[in-house]
C-alpha cells in the first residue's frame, strides 16, 4: 500500500544521518524507480539543496534535512501525501519553493495532500492544493 499509494514526510524526518542526502533520496527511488536521476536533480535545484546532495545528512541544517525529506517523499507514486510539520524549519523562500514543488507533484499525480501545522509562514497554501 505505501509503495504506490501513500507517501509521508515525517515530522522527525527519519533520515539516515550517516548517508548522504542523495543516498537517502535514492533509498526510496530505488524501490519505486519512479524518478530519473535528472528529475531528482531538478527537484533538488528547486529546493536549493543541490550543493548538499553529497553531504551526510547529520551535518545538514534541520531546514536542509526537511527539504531532503520532501524530495525523498516525492520519489514515489502516491495517491495521498501526508506532510507532518514539513515546513517548520524552512525559511519563507525555500518554503514557497517546497510548496510549489509539492503542489506540482500532487497535481501531476492527481493526489490528495494532508498537511499538519502549517502556521503563518505557509498562509494561503491550502488555496493552491489540488485534491
Describe these PLM feature segments.
Residues 70:
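Hydrophobic anchor residue at the start of the ABC signature
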Residues 12, 19-31:
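Q-loop/switch helix immediately C-terminal to the Walker
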Residues 81-84:
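Catalytic Walker B motif of ABC-type/P-loop ATPase nucleotide-binding domains
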Residues 37-52:
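Conserved ABC ATPase "signature" region
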Residues 56-60, 64:
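Conserved ABC ATPase signature
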Residues 77:
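Conserved catalytic motifs of ABC-family nucleotide-binding domains
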Residues 11-16, 118-119:
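Catalytic "switch" loops of ABC-type ATPases
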Amino acid at each position: 500500500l505505501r509503495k504506490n499509494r501513500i507517501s509521508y514526510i515525517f515530522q522527525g524526518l527519519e533520515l539516515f544521518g550517516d548517508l548522504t542526502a542523495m543516498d537517502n533520496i535514492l533509498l526510496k527511488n530505488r524501490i519505486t524507480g519512479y524518478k530519473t536521476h535528472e528529475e531528482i536533480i531538478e527537484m533538488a535545484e528547486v529546493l536549493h539543496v543541490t550543493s548538499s546532495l553529497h553531504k551526510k545528512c547529520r551535518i545538514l541544517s534541520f531546514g536542509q534535512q526537511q527539504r531532503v525529506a520532501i524530495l525523498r517523499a516525492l520519489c514515489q507514486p502516491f495517491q495521498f501525501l501526508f506532510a507532518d510539520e514539513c515546513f517548520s524549519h524552512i525559511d519563507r523562500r525555500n518554503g514557497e519553493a517546497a510548496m510549489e514543488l509539492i503542489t506540482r507533484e500532487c497535481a501531476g499525480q492527481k493526489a490528495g495532500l494532508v498537511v499538519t501545522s502549517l502556521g503563518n509562514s505557509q498562509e494561503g497554501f491550502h488555496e493552491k492544493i489540488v485534491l
